[in-house]
Amino acid sequence: MHNFEEELTCPICYSIFEDPRVLPCSHTFCRNCLENVLQASGNFYIWRPLRIPLKCPNCRSIIEIASTGIESLPVNFALRAIIEKYQQEDHPDVVTCPEHYRQPLNVYCLLDKKLVCGHCLTIGQHHGHPIDDLQSAYLKEKDTPQKLLKQLTDTHWTDITRLIEKLEEQKCHSEKIVQGDKEVVLQYFKELIDTLEQKKKYFLAALCDVGKMINQEYTPQIQGMKEIREQQLELMTITTSLQDESPLKFLEKIDEVRQRVQMLKQRPLPEVQPVEIYPRVSNVLKEEWSRIEIGRIKKAVIPEMRVSSKRTPCSWSDNDEKEMELFKILNIAIVSLISVILMLILLFNHHIITFLNEITSICFSEVFLSVYQSLSKNLYDLNNTVCYTLYLLKEFMWKIVSR
């Protein structure tokens, strides 16, 4: 605390003097502080009711004051003037209490370990706490920074520094791992997308080839039928015009027209048979590719698609009762045998292929997958061939029986 400020502080409340009063012993105190001391003493002489004894809080001498109490003590006008002038000036080097206006922090509270003002000790939250003056408190705590500095430089903090370095190193290592994984993910899906794009191109190219096959299958037939149609229309025009010709020209042309019509009618017509595309891409994608593991897509085989004439199905839809009865009588043994063979083929083709589809997605390697797809195609061709052969055999036997 500033020396000059200390002279303006009440020794009882440790605040700047308020209404300072002078005792006969020349010591000065706040009026309120003296009233509190007087009330606390309770010393009254019965035989001298006009005088009230008071012990000076500073020198401990007994003095007597008038019965009017502390108001009878003279005011220390000189000190009050100095205080008023002091309070009007700015003192940046003096720290004041944030809770009590213009009261200096001139006392150290031992309980709360902080600076307080006189008001904090008398009417504030530090009332009744043990206190010490600033100089004594400073001397007691003067060596504390060295002790704290020693604590802050021991091995504990060295371990913390090492721990920070280790954590930073682990963080950097983990971030590198994450970054590496990101690059792996990007590369993996890039290769996967490239593979899928390549497979898509292969599928589309195969379908384009199938389209060319279909065009080669139907275009010549359609063109031939269009030529026949054009010749028909031409002959119709010629035939119509002959009716207006003279008998001579009519007879000259009619035989030629007749021969052309007969030749046109005798011209063989192609047998219209629907073609079948095998395998169907939708079935391949649904039944085979949907079960392929992602890691095997790159080695997955694109099936060879073909276009072939659709065979007569292995079924009979003849509603003629006599024909069916005769056929049953003459061919009961053969039909029974054929039925058994047909059931075995169809059963094998349905269940075994389904089973192979399931096994393929789980444990088949790329080589077995290719073999499986080839086997599936061959089974399909075998099924169609057998059905068509049975159909021809049935037609042949029916012709023999009919004769």
Curated annotation (Swiss-Prot):
Single annotated GO MF: ubiquitin protein ligase activity
Reactions catalysed according to its record: S-ubiquitinyl-[E2 ubiquitin-conjugating enzyme]-L-cysteine + [acceptor protein]-L-lysine = [E2 ubiquitin-conjugating enzyme]-L-cysteine + N(6)-ubiquitinyl-[acceptor protein]-L-lysine
SUPFAM superfamilies xrefs: B-box zinc-binding domain, RING/U-box
Transmembrane segments: 329-349
Disrupted gene: phenotype observed: TRIM59-deficiency causes early embryonic lethality. Affects the expression of gastrulation-associated genes during early embryonic development.
One Pfam family this sequence matches: zf-B_box
InterPro entries: Znf-RING_euk, Znf_B-box, Znf_RING, Znf_RING/FYVE/PHD, Znf_RING_CS
Example of a GO cellular component annotation carried by this entry: endoplasmic reticulum
Topology of this chain in the membrane: Single-pass membrane protein
Tissue: Moderately expressed in the spleen, brain and heart and very highly expressed in the testis.
Subcellular location(s) per record: Endoplasmic reticulum membrane
Zinc finger (B box-type): 92-134
Zn finger (RING-type) start-end: 10-60
Oligomer and partners: Interacts with ECSIT.
Biological role stated in the UniProt entry: E3 ubiquitin ligase involved in different processes such as development and immune response. Serves as a negative regulator for innate immune signaling pathways by suppressing RLR-induced activation of IRF3/7 and NF-kappa-B via interaction with adapter ECSIT. Regulates autophagy through modulating both the transcription and the ubiquitination of BECN1. On the one hand, regulates the transcription of BECN1 through negatively modulating the NF-kappa-B pathway.
Protein name, as recorded: Tripartite motif-containing protein 59
Species, as recorded: Mus musculus (Mouse)
Gene name tied to this protein: Trim59
